[in-house]
From Swiss-Prot:
<dbReference type="GO" id="GO:0005524">
    <property type="term" value="F:ATP binding"/>
</dbReference>
<keyword id="KW-1208">Phospholipid metabolism</keyword>
<keyword id="KW-0594">Phospholipid biosynthesis</keyword>
<keyword id="KW-0418">Kinase</keyword>
<keyword id="KW-0443">Lipid metabolism</keyword>
<dbReference type="GO" id="GO:0016310">
    <property type="term" value="P:phosphorylation"/>
</dbReference>
<comment type="pathway">
    <text>Phospholipid metabolism; phosphatidylethanolamine biosynthesis; phosphatidylethanolamine from ethanolamine: step 1/3.</text>
</comment>
<dbReference type="GO" id="GO:0035264">
    <property type="term" value="P:multicellular organism growth"/>
</dbReference>
<dbReference type="GO" id="GO:0001890">
    <property type="term" value="P:placenta development"/>
</dbReference>
<keyword id="KW-0444">Lipid biosynthesis</keyword>
<protein>
    <recommendedName>
        <fullName>Ethanolamine kinase 2</fullName>
        <ecNumber>2.7.1.82</ecNumber>
    </recommendedName>
</protein>
<dbReference type="GO" id="GO:0001701">
    <property type="term" value="P:in utero embryonic development"/>
</dbReference>
<comment type="similarity">
    <text>Belongs to the choline/ethanolamine kinase family.</text>
</comment>
<keyword id="KW-0547">Nucleotide-binding</keyword>
<dbReference type="GO" id="GO:0006646">
    <property type="term" value="P:phosphatidylethanolamine biosynthetic process"/>
</dbReference>
<dbReference type="InterPro" id="IPR011009">
    <property type="entry name" value="Kinase-like_dom_sf"/>
</dbReference>
<dbReference type="GO" id="GO:0009791">
    <property type="term" value="P:post-embryonic development"/>
</dbReference>
Length: 385
């Protein structure tokens, strides 16, 4: 997809300074105590009032439940005029667009949570993250929640693919948007990263509920346990800052609006405070794609360096030094290992419970194989002095 040249990055301290706390971001003393104790999902800001409807939408027959919700959210729409469009790219949830006008300028997305995804996602925290990002201009409007999902505003633009996110004009926009999100912070003490608690939670599920039925292509549970301990020991020493992260920036979660010349990130169910380098490394892994995974598309060093320079200059408002870029480069590629491990565990759980048509087991094997393939090379990367 051809992308017109964009303006140079402004370099002033004002450009992406650390954002001021918003009124929704204050924590109670109880929440601070929970975060400091190392809960698996640090709490987000208190939820503002969002309508909640006692409607359950059937996984295999979304339309009737979706139309009940539309009657509440868009009472002026005539039922016979409502059009729908099913999006089939998602591998966690099911998504339906409801609209009347052809241009979809007013369009309600109805997202139905995937089967047993409460094992993977804290849905209460997802809504808080949605509101937090919306308060900072980084998310669409959240219209309501219902018993097994939520409804929100359709973001105008094109969902990107692996062939798009490697284009310099586009990856610059992605780097700037990630830098913006990484400046969002909660009041009070900084939460602990979600990574280790989530990975331990996923591993425990695999060990206790899934391991007897694991394919021979999947590493043994004892090996996974050793690797998880190794990751925590080595990556925790890298001093990567803890920031507010998207944590799931695959291509289809990036919407490009060519009219406005900007990108918007969608789907915040895995968002939360985490290591800066994990969010970036995870995105770099997504250059390989999901449905057809090809790690030859992992960004080359030159591409990464340019991407990281855009990111750092947006964050700092000044030029990034070679040492800063090299340091982040090493951190990002090391944390990309954790991304492989995280999503491989996730895929094993999805393989057990999900009703979505996707070969989760094959995906888990691909991610584990890539983890072990690149581990020696990545482990040898030295942090600049």
């Amino acid at each position: 997809m051809a992308v017109p040249p964009s303006a140079p990055v402004p370099c002033s301290p004002f450009y992406l300074r650390r954002q001021e706390p918003c009124p929704q971001c204050s924590w109670s003393m109880e929440e601070k105590a929970v975060a400091s104790a190392g809960c698996w999902e640090p709490p987000g800001p208190p939820r503002a009032a969002v309508p909640c409807f006692s409607v359950t939408v059937e996984q295999d027959d979304i339309l009737p439940g979706a139309l009940r919700l539309i009657r509440e959210l868009r009472p002026h729409w005539k039922p016979e005029q409502v059009r729908t469009k099913r999006f089939k790219d998602g591998i966690t949830n099911k998504l339906l667009a409801c609209y009347v006008e052809e241009d979809m300028r007013d369009c309600v997305l109805v997202r139905v949570y995937g089967e047993r995804t409460e094992l993977l996602v804290d849905r209460e925290n997802e809504v808080r993250n949605f509101q937090l990002l919306r308060a900072h201009g980084c998310a669409p409007k959240l219209y309501c929640t219902f018993q097994n999902g939520l409804c929100y505003e359709y973001v105008q633009g094109v969902a990107l693919g692996p062939e798009h996110i490697r284009e310099p004009q586009l990856f610059r926009l992605i780097a700037l948007e990630m830098a913006k999100i990484h400046t969002i912070h909660a009041n009070g003490s900084l939460p602990k990263p979600t990574l280790w608690h989530k990975m331990h939670r996923y591993f425990t599920l695999v060990k206790d509920e899934i391991s007897p039925s694991l394919s021979a292509d999947v590493p043994k549970v004892e090996v996974l346990e050793q690797e998880l301990a190794w990751l925590k020991e080595h990556l925790s020493q890298l001093d990567s800052p803890v920031v507010f992260c998207h944590n799931d920036l695959l291509c289809k979660n990036i919407i490009y609006d060519s009219d406005k010349g900007r990108v918007c990130f969608i789907d915040y169910e895995y968002a939360g405070y985490n290591y800066q380098a994990f969010d970036i490394g995870n995105h770099f892994n997504e250059f390989a794609g999901v449905n057809v995974v090809d790690y030859s598309r992992y960004p080359a060093r030159e591409t990464q360096v340019q991407w990281l320079r855009y990111y750092l200059e947006a964050q700092k408002g000044t030029a990034a030094s070679p040492r800063e870029v090299e340091r982040l480069y090493a951190q990002v590629n090391k944390f990309a290992l954790a991304s492989h491990f995280f999503w491989a565990l996730w895929a094993l759980i999805q393989n057990q419970y999900s009703t979505i048509s996707f070969d989760f087991l094959r995906y888990a094997v691909i991610r584990f194989n890539q983890y072990f393939k690149v581990k020696p090379q990545v482990s040898a990367l030295e942090m600049p002095k």
